[in-house]
Structures are given as C-alpha cells and as structure tokens.
Amino acid sequence: MTEQRRSPNKRANKPPALSGLSSRTGRLPASALRPLVLAMAGLSVGAHAQMSSSAVPDIDQTESVVETAPEVPLAPPVSGELVPRLAEPAKTTQPGESPPAFVSGDRLTGYNERGVVLEGNAELRRGGAVVKGDKLTYDQDTDEAFAHGNARVSRGGALAVGPEARMKVEANEGYMLSPDYYFQQTGGTGKAERIDFIDKDRSVIKRATYTTCSPDNADWYFSARQLDLDSDREVGVAYGGVLHFFDVPIAGAPVFSFPLTDERRSGFLSPLFGYGSKSGLDVTLPYYFNIAPNRDLTLYPRIMTSRGFMLGGDYRYIGQGYSGRLRAEILPDDRQTNSNRWSYSFQHTQNLAKGLNAYLNLNRVSDDRYPDDLTRTVAQSTQRQYIQEGGVTYNWQDFTVLARVQKFQTLLPSGPSYEREPQLNGKYIRYDLGGFDVQVEADYTRFRIPLTSTGFQQPQGERMFVQPTISYPIVRPGWYATPKVIFNATQYQMEPQSNTPTAQNNFSRTVPTFSFDSGMTFERDAPTMSRVFGVNYLQTLEPRLFYVYTPFRDQSQFPLFDTVQSDFGYGQIFSENPFTGYDRVADNNKLTAGLTTRLIEADTGIERFRGTIAQRYDFSGQRVQINGTLPDPKAGSSDLLAATTIQLFRGYYLDAGIQYNPDSEHINYSNLAFAWRPEPRKLLNVGYRYRRATSVTDNTAIDQFEISGQWPITQRAYGIGRFAFDRNANQMVDALAGLEYAADCWVGRVVYQRYRNTTQGYTGRIFLQVEFRGLSKIGSNPLDILRLNVPGYEPVTAKPVPTTQFDHYE
C-alpha cells in the first residue's frame, strides 16, 4: 500500500465499512488491514493481530484505505510534517507475553497477511531492539526482519550501521555486513567486516576496530581478528589484538580483555615507560584481575634493559571481619649486582571477637641499595627503615589493651633502632567522671637493639611505667580553665653490658606534674574589613595562659629507648613535657602566654585570617636535657613564636611562621608557604624553610627554598614543574619537569625527575605514560610522583568531543 500524506490541517474522513473493500486477487479482511493502517498512524502492529490467508491487497485501493483510517489526535506540526501519536498509551507487556512490534515508513505493503514491507524511512521497534533501513521486510510468523540500504540496528545501548542487516527481532539474533558501530556507555566506535548478534547481550565482530576517539580523528584504535562483546558481563575480549597509536602499532596480544563500562573489570592498565641512569629503559605493563567483588590482583611485569625482568604483584582482599593487602616484587639475577633482588609488604587486620582484633604489618627488602635502585619516588628511595610488627588490641568501654612485637629492618648508612620484644600497654580513659577527665596508662616493654655496623652493643633492657592523669575542665561561654595533674612512675631493669660490667642496671623515677591551661575569647564585628572586602566579618581576640610545674629528677643515667627532643613550636610550647616518649620528664616552672586573632566570615564561618604570637618564660631554668643534666640552668624567656595564615582572596593562600630569639637577635627558624590557585589546574607554590643549627637539631642547619606549579601552555597542554635548592650546600635537592597533553581520547604524560640520593649522588629518571580513554583509565606512577611533589596538582583528563541528546538517539 502507498501512504498518502495529509496536510496538518486536513481531517480524516469518516471511515466506511471495511468489509466492502476488495483486491485483484481476493478479499482482505478488516482484521488484517487494521494493524497495517494503524501502524502508519503510529499505532502498534501487535503479535496478536490475526491475518487470514488472503492475497496482497489491490494497489488501486490504497487511497481509500488511507482515507478510512480511524481519526487520531494530531500532535503540533513540526516544519509542516505530521508527527504520528498513539491515540492511547501503549499497553505494558505482561510477564510471559511477547512484546508488540511497532512499524512505520513512507510506504507500507502487506503480504501473506502476516508480513509487511516498508520503504522509505522504514523502522521496526520491538522490545528493546530497533531496526531501520531504506527498505525493511518483516515477517510476524518468523519474527525475521531484513533491512536493506542504510541499515541501522540498535540494542542494549549499542548501535550498528551498515548496508544490510537480518534480525530475529525478539530473540536479538542476526547479522550485519560491513558495520560501523557505537557503544553508548563508553562512547567507543569502530568498523568491522561483519557483526553477528548472538542474543540480547552477546555479539561477535569479525575484523574489527575499536576506539573512543571521534571517527574523523582516531589518534588511537584497537584492531582485532575477532571481538567478543558481552554487555551483561560488561566486558569485551579481543583475539589477535593490536593497539595502534597514530597508525603505528605499539602493543599486541593474542588475547586481550577490556571493560565496556566504567565498572571495575579485568584487563591491562596504563603502560608505564621510563628511563633511569642505572636501570636503562624501564617498561611496566600492569594487568588487573577482578577476582571477586571483595578481592583483586594487579600484576606488574617490568622490563629494565640494564637489569632484567622484574615481576611485581598487589593483592587486596576484604571480608567479614578481616581485610588485607600483599605487595611483592622479585628481580631474579640483577645484571648490575649479580644477585636476586626482592621486596614485600603485607598488612592484615582480623576481628577475633567483639572488641578483640589482631593485625600484622610486615615489610622487608633484599638489600641496602634496593630503595635507591628499584623504587620510583623520592620518598621510597630515601626510606631507610622497614617495620615488621604484629599485635593484638582489645577495646571494652573505656579500656584499651595492646600487645605487640615490633622490629625493624634498618638500611645502611642509618643506625639501628630499638625494637619492642614485646610491648604490653593498657589505657583507661574516662571523660566527665563527676566533672573530671581521667586517664591511666600502664606499659611494659622489653627493648632490644641490633649491633651497630661497627659491632657496638647499645644498652638494652626492660621499662615499666604507670602514668595516671586527672584534669578538671571548666568551660564557660567566652572562657575556659583546665587544671591537670600527671604522675609518672617508671622502673628500668637493664641488661649487663660487656663494655661496662660495673654499670648500674636498675633505675627508677617518680615525677609529679601540675599544669593549668586557661583562655578567653572576645568577639566583635569588623566593619572596616567588611567595607573593604564587601563581606561581613567577625574578629576574635583569644588570649591564652599555660603554666606547668614539674620538680627536678636526675635522669642522666637513664637510657633513651624511644625519646627525642620535640621541635620547638606551638605544640611543644603549650605542653607539659618538651620530650616525646617516656624516658625523659623535664623539670618545669614555666609560664606560656599566647594571643590569637582571627577574621571569620559571619555568614559562612570560613576563617580568612589567623595570626598568633606566643612566648614562654622559664622561672628557674630546665636542668633535664636529652643527653644529660645541665648543671647551672638560667631563668629566662624562650624564643618568640609568631605565625599567620591568610586566605582573604579567592585562590590565594599564605602560611608563614617565625621563631625569633630576642637576646641574640637571631631568627632560629622560619617558614613561608605561598600558593596561588586561580582556576583548576592553574597553580603556583612557593616555599622557604630556614633553621639555624643548634644542639637540639644536632647541628643540622636548613636553608632551602622550593617552587612548584602546574599551568596550561595551550588549551590541551599543561606544564608541571618543581625545583628545590639547598643554599647551605649550594646544590639542588631535587627537580622535576613534566608535560601533560589531553586529547579528546587520550592523555600523554612525560616527566623527568632528578634528586639527591642517600649516597650523596644524584638519580635521574624519565617517565612516559599514555592513557587511552575507555581502554585504560587507571593512572600509574607519574601521577603519584606529581601529587607528592606538586601540592594541589590535578591530573588532566581526556576531553572528548561534546555530544548532544540527538546524537545516536536510538
């Protein structure tokens, strides 16, 4: 039949009785004509429509058939076209029922009472499948559709376009020749020799390509002898696959799997390319195994041309009451050292019962040079200590108990550290017990230490202490006061040493401490600042007084198991003890005064400015020192501390601090950190750090500055850099330069890093990474290096060509 288009303003004639129609070959019953006529008006041709065995209707009757179509409401015209609409909402398919079919076209012809031929903008929809073409033949008995000319098949979020296609529509079975295809979930496209539709989820593509680039600018594509796609499992498998980058093959694999969505899937991750002065060309191609929702494994095959083949693995797991991670690397027969190189790291936590937990943290490397030779970051390469620890913790109400063994692997040239074999620790913490805060800590530890590199044995022994603390916080609007009492009782049992056989082996100490912390907060409007910045500001003034008293106890013969001098700063100046650990308790008769002022946005509560100044006065002088006793201490004031943090302007951040000695008129410590971040991926960081050499810092002076940043060079290219310089040594500490380029479907990164290593030499490395959007999305080591070295760094991402809701609208 031939459809005659109606003007939008022309109404359908009243339909006569259909039984009077005839054809050249026989009568076509109304039950057969009705679905075909209604289909042209936008109604469904349901599978339940009953056609008799009459012949094809008479072509001469076409006009009368169209004119007798039932009247249906017309949608508003669009550019003069009639837009068909359903007179009633389509009925929902019940479970077990076959879904109805919907057909439309410029010309529609029925045959064999159960078939239909559509020509011109032909379209068939059934269930979730859509078949289109210049000409489309559909047989309801076999549910077969054949599209010829500009055939389009849409199903399961995928669209295929080719010269012809044949489909069993409800079963989603069929094929298409020479298709172009598009995947909605990933934005990927490709071409093929043939595509076979197995069912609604699976398809097989022969001689296929795949890319997430725009079809007109495919910088990279993946070609394969065969692609097996499974939308239910959301994974694709390629056989005989080759990855092309700017038409150059760069990688291949006999079998290759890749995700069809952003969900976690097994497959290759971003390859990592690098070059090291000692390792040569360095290539890593990680492979990710999605074993289960709660377990995964990543293998890191790594080839270093100057050393050999290295294999690394990272296994993670989590379950009901337990979790853990195992990382390991092995390099058999390193060509540089003629030895096997390896490392491992294992962490595990286990819930044994309610409140009872066990843990393991084991880390080790094969030799002292492993971090310098085989790690990829400055932090890893300078690590000289690896912990091995296992323990059990128990928590019940206000009680906490810890039992652990802690050992270390210390690499040369660093000296060994004390190990806990074992430690038993218990704490009781109770807040607001009749207004009091109560804490009691008891500890037993046996300290052991390996021989030094020269064979010297340092002191070893056992330490037991009990330290109860009680405070009474008084907090009122605008002010607070907290008196506190601490009592420390410590007992040492030392092991005899061959080099000092007559030395005393038993020590004990009981030391009380009293402190009183108090402060006030005054608040007012800041009209001047409000006028300048156009924002309502509040200003605070917060004075603070802190007094501490501890009597002197001679501790010059006590060992130093876990105690060091705290760096002088705000944390130390308002504390009861200037030492960390429990081997030293300083004698105190000190008063600290501090003053803080803040500017706060009244509407948002954001702190835009904070300035603090503080100083401590020692009334009697401190005799207890980290390495002995000062015989004649003098009273006096400490260094003056001042610090400020400023964020008054959007995108600007300033943090500065200074430690000034009024007596010597020297600056003993200062730091400055400035950051400018006007937009995402636009940042500039400037830092400076200075420390004068003192006995507390082991005569180690610091005078360093650094600058780092990230900035767009073009719309798609970004530069990243860092430079740190030591003025005392008059040499570079470390430097980094990198370039990132974001295309529509890939991101390229090249990073060069040079840093001073532990042997006073320099290590230089180059990293190169290409990340293909939709094929490999997990970043690798260059991202970690950039995040560690450039504060605020944001990795660039691919910038796909924008699409609209009208693209691939099927």
From Swiss-Prot:
Transmembrane segments: none annotated. It is found in: Cell outer membrane. Keywords: Cell outer membrane, Membrane, Signal. Residues 1-26, 54-79 are annotated as: Disordered. GO terms for biological process: Gram-negative-bacterium-type cell outer membrane assembly; lipopolysaccharide transport. Component of the lipopolysaccharide transport and assembly complex. Interacts with LptE and LptA. Together with LptE, is involved in the assembly of lipopolysaccharide (LPS) at the surface of the outer membrane. This is LPS-assembly protein LptD. It comes from Cupriavidus pinatubonensis (strain JMP 134 / LMG 1197) (Cupriavidus necator (strain JMP 134)). The gene is lptD.
